[in-house]
């Protein structure tokens, strides 16, 4: 990976960009994953590169739903494995959820490489999706394959950085679907039951914190959080945040105000 000086004003953005490139070079991330990352980065600019209140609200509801679930599953793709492998394992443990590798551009080599990356952080972790035997109805070819003991039987599924038709297909199967997507206009964002509009590198650590904080909540408290959540309002609030932020920036001006030395 390219050595980026920490003094660089865009250090973290460049760092995670390099992680995605490294993921592709290792064989985990598909070429299309780089395009998807760039699109997400553009929306991160728009929201201000921070966790906004609608995302925090969505994360609390998502964690509550997972803590209530009987068969929770977290899906892992190439971008997730490249960006947050350690945090993915921490989140699965905090939510008592299973991990399943589920890929749009599936090859056995990619699956094996992603599993190896995850096991660097926990050699004993159970990873599903290695030999899937079931298929999501309506999804053809490799990308429709799921594990019988994972997504196939899950009641609640977290599908971060996911494509819209698979999100929709899971909802049609009766799954409660949570997604992490920086684009509030994407089909995944609009199809999911809970949409966390945040960068996954911020969202997963925060969800781990919330899971540890909320694990002792009563069932009634968790049900109340889920019951009061409105995903339509969350997405609308994200769009309003972007609108208001852009309006404020336009009014204040974004051009440099002084001569450079």
Curated annotation (Swiss-Prot):
Activity increases with temperature elevation from 65 degrees Celsius to 95 degrees Celsius. It catalyses: (R)-4-phosphopantoate + beta-alanine + ATP = (R)-4'-phosphopantothenate + AMP + diphosphate + H(+). Disruption phenotype: Only viable in the presence of CoA or 4'-phosphopantothenate. Pfam families: PPS_PS (PF02006). Keywords: ATP-binding, Coenzyme A biosynthesis, Ligase, Nucleotide-binding. GO terms for biological process: coenzyme A biosynthetic process. Pathway: Cofactor biosynthesis; coenzyme A biosynthesis. Gene3D superfamilies: Phosphopantoate/pantothenate synthetase. Its EC number is 6.3.2.36. It comes from the Archaea. Activity is not affected by 4'-phosphopantothenate or CoA/acetyl-CoA. ATP binds at residues 17, 39, 181-183, 187-188, 199-200. Optimum pH is 6.5. The keyword Electron transport does not apply. Changing residue 17 to A: Strong decrease in activity. GO terms for molecular function: acid-amino acid ligase activity; ATP binding. Catalyzes the condensation of (R)-4-phosphopantoate and beta-alanine to 4'-phosphopantothenate in the CoA biosynthesis pathway. Cannot use (R)-pantoate as substrate and thus does not display pantothenate synthetase (PS) activity. Displays strict specificity for its natural substrates, 4-phosphopantoate, ATP and beta-alanine. Belongs to the archaeal phosphopantothenate synthetase family. Homodimer. This is 4-phosphopantoate--beta-alanine ligase. The lineage of its organism: Archaea, Methanobacteriati, Methanobacteriota, Thermococci, Thermococcales.
């Amino acid at each position: 990976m390219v050595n980026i000086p920490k003094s660089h004003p865009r250090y973290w953005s460049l760092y995670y960009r390099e992680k995605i490139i490294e993921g592709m070079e290792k064989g985990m991330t598909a070429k299309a994953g780089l395009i998807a990352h760039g699109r997400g980065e553009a929306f991160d600019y728009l929201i201000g590169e921070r966790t906004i209140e609608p995302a925090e609200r969505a994360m609390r509801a998502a964690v509550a739903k997972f803590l209530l679930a009987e068969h929770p599953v977290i899906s892992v793709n190439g971008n997730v494995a490249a960006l947050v492998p350690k945090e993915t394992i921490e989140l699965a443990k905090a939510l008592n959820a299973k991990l399943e590798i589920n890929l749009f551009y599936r090859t056995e080599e990619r699956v094996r490489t992603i599993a190896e990356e995850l096991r660097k952080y926990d050699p004993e972790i159970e990873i599903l999706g290695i030999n899937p035997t079931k298929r999501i109805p309506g999804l053809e070819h490799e990308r429709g394959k799921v594990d019988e003991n994972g997504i196939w039987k899950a009641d609640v599924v977290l599908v971060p950085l996911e494509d819209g038709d698979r999100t929709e297909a899971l909802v049609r199967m009766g799954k409660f679907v949570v997604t992490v997507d920086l684009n509030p206009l994407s089909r995944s964002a609009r199809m999911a039951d809970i949409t966390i509009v945040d960068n996954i590198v911020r969202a997963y650590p925060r969800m781990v914190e919330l899971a540890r904080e909320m694990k002792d909540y009563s069932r009634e408290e968790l049900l109340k959080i889920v019951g009061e959540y409105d995903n339509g309002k969350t997405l609308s609030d994200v769009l309003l945040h972007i609108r208001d932020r852009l309006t404020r920036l336009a009014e204040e001006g974004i051009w440099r105000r002084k001569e450079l030395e």
